[in-house]
Amino acid sequence: MKCKKLISGIVAIMLVAVLAFGSTAAAVGAQADNGADLALASQNVSELTATTDSSASSRADSLDDINEAISVIKVILGAFSSSDKLTWDSFKTGVSRLFYMSVDKLIDSLVVGLSKVFPLMSRPDEADYKFTNSNVGSKSFNDKAADGARWNVGYSSATLLTGNELDGNHYVGGSLSYPNPKHPTEILDDLRVRVFAMSDGTDNGIVVYAVLDAYGLAAKDVREIRSRIAGFIKNKNIVSVNISTLHQHSAIDTLGLNGDLNKVLFGNTFKNAVGMDPSTLHNGQNKEYMEHLYKTTADTIVAAVNNMEPGEMYFSQTDVHEYIRDKRDPQTFDPNLNRLCFVPDNRESKPTWIVNAAIHCVGLGAGTTSVSGDYPYFIEKQVNAAGANYVQIQGAELAITSQTAPVAVEGHTRYQTAEAYGNKLGEILVAADKGSRVEPILNIAHRDVFVTVDNHALEFIASTGLLANEAVKAKYVSMRIPTEIGYMEIGTNLAF
């Protein structure tokens, strides 16, 4: 028994080292095509979340791996049949893919082996899990504006900082850090929550979006925020409360991923081995900070709803492709700053700009210990100076990040470059035309779903207690995550 525990510990340390020095956190988003059909979206959700036989799934995965390897080898061999530069580039790309495939399989094998001997936290069965504080969505989907329909929008914002972030009990998001944890060392600007509430003036209900300057947020934390204002949500006919983050790598860790890996490796292992309550496990969340986040976000949602007023909505797209890059070829990304501009009837009130863009907030580097809102902080300053409120919704980013070459100055720090980058995008937004009028039509639908975790590294990390996400055991797979998916239509040709 002692020998088994010793082996487990050695393998665990190896894994922590591999993960700490070879991994960075990534976020994946998805956007629906404009005018997408709700029924098709629902069908895709059903297919995504359907439970499949584990052996069949395993065979399919193996075949996919084999086919991918064969395709890569073909590319490499094909490069020798021509001296064409494009083919040579394909050869180098193929070699890189083969290398990363091999490393990925090595890490995956280590994690699978470790999971068999490492004491992991217990999970409830999927059948016993109950979703709470769910979004209900619109009672009907309308394809034209109702008689007398008008856009009504409200805005509010508040700081998420408590003043205690440098006390040594908080962690910074971004890349994993081992053996030394990433405690914040300086506060460079602000981390905020920005909220807008909107309706089309009908009884179809109010939709709320709260966007946090944060590394990430688990679904259970989203539902906790909703629970704080459950009565208000019901009384105000709020049919959807959406809470997302801008995924700043320089924000306080609200997802849990960047906790002290030594405490996870040793402390959580012991607690899991003796069956202690999972709530006692260590992760990167600071309880006082999270409580402040819950309360502040809930209060800001209430304020935004109470600030709603009638006006007109406009939509514009501004091409900023020279300021965006994909870190992985081919270069594929949305080149636009997609803006909804609400202009209130009351000219004494400020317009509200809602901007969707897919640009990673990693200006200070993935390993920074400085706290900053990154480039969105500086965009907001430009927009505020022009007399408007600002909310940014992060798009499908993953490896898509900022192209700072046009604004970079030799000798500047990364923070100064992030400032210049944000200022530039802000200036472009301020100069943009307000766009075309959007009909007052607002439809939204939601579904609670379970998503299978097929990344063994993430599965293992979650099972140590490092992540704040809830997870359940399923019949044919070892872990599924309870989450939710939504689909929204604005006007006659916009969908999110």
What are these model-predicted stretches?
Residues 35-54, 75:
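N-terminal, intrinsically disordered, polar/charged segments of Gram-positive cell-envelope systems
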Residues 1-5:
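Positively charged n-region of N-terminal signal peptides that target proteins for export
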Residues 425:
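Anionic-ligand-binding alpha/beta catalytic cores of soluble enzymes and soluble regulatory domains
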Residues 20-41:
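Sec-dependent signal peptide cleavage junction
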Residues 7-25:
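Sec-dependent N-terminal signal peptides of Gram-positive bacterial secreted proteins and lipoproteins
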Residues 61-244, 248-420, 433, 440-496:
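Conserved beta-alpha junction segments in alpha/beta enzyme cores
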